[in-house]
Amino acid sequence: MKRTMQILVGMVGLLNFLIGLGFLFNPSKMATEFALSPLGTQGMATMRADFPAFFLTGAIFSLIGAWRADRTPLMVPLMLLTFALLGRFVSIALDGAAPTTVPPMIIEAAMIGLLGLAYRSFGKQAN
C-alpha cells in the first residue's frame, strides 16, 4: 500500500509541477485553459509569479513526501489544495456556479483525498 501511495502522490506532484511550469513559461496558453484574463504586462507577471508559486510549491512537497514516504511534507499540498477548494466554495456562494465550476473541484477534492490517504499510509516516521 505504501509503495502504491508513493507512486500516486508522485503523479500528483508531477501533474502540479507541469502546470506550474506551464504558467511560468507559457502563461497565455494556461490562462485559456484556466479561464483567466490577465490584464497587460502586470497581469502576465502575476500569472508567472503567483500561479507557479502555488503549483510548484505543492508539487515539490508532494514529490518530497512521495520520495521519502514521509507524511510531513504532504501537509503543504494538503493545505494549498484545501484553501483552493474552499475558495471555490466561497466563489459559488458569492458569484454562483457556471457549467465549468465542478470539474476542477472534483480534481482538487481527489488530490486532497489521495494526499490524505498517503498521509495516513506513510505513518508518523519517514522511511
Model-identified regions with their sequence ranges:
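Core segments of alpha-helical transmembrane spans in multipass integral membrane proteins
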Residues: G43-I64, M79, F83
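N-terminal signal-anchor transmembrane alpha helix
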Residues: I7-F23
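Membrane-interfacial loop-to-transmembrane alpha-helix junctions, especially the N-terminal start
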Residues: D70-L80
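Membrane-helix boundary connector in multi-pass membrane proteins
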Residues: W67, L86-V102
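Small-residue-rich transmembrane alpha-helices that serve as helix-helix interface/gating elements
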Residues: V102-L114
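Aromatic-anchored segments of alpha-helical transmembrane domains
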Residues: N16-I19, L80-V90
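Interfacial loop at the N-terminal end of multi-pass membrane proteins
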Residues: P27-M47
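Membrane-water interface at the C-terminal end of transmembrane alpha helices
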Residues: M111-N127
